[in-house]
Amino acid sequence: MPIIQFGEKDLLRGKVVLPAWYRMRIDEIGEAPSKDGGSTNYPVAGTILHNADDGSTDFAGVPIDWNFNSKAIGFAVGFLEAFGVKAEAGKRFDLNSAVGKELDVYVENGEYQGRIVNRVNHKYRAPR
């Protein structure tokens, strides 16, 4: 008999949040080739701590995942700047240095395969 068990994050993964700025902790940043092998994906996993504007914890604990891609790496500039890092041409950056740190991320709602999902459209700011 197959037996499964859920963790707290599993139960919150599909929860759709209200569009807003959220304080988020970066839990993990990975690196993997894209499906076609023509670029590299950098998946980011974060967890909402609270609403960054009003402090509400209604969506605390909700995991949010998004991605950077080597073919459009310019979208990572705002992410780095939110940590006080100045992006410069030719300079290399270790995305893993963001793991465990906090920043404010604007989370929107979007549609994916006919359902409403949380979406990060690369709007970042330093915590206020």
Predicted regions and their residues:
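Short beta-rich binding modules
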Residues: 1-128
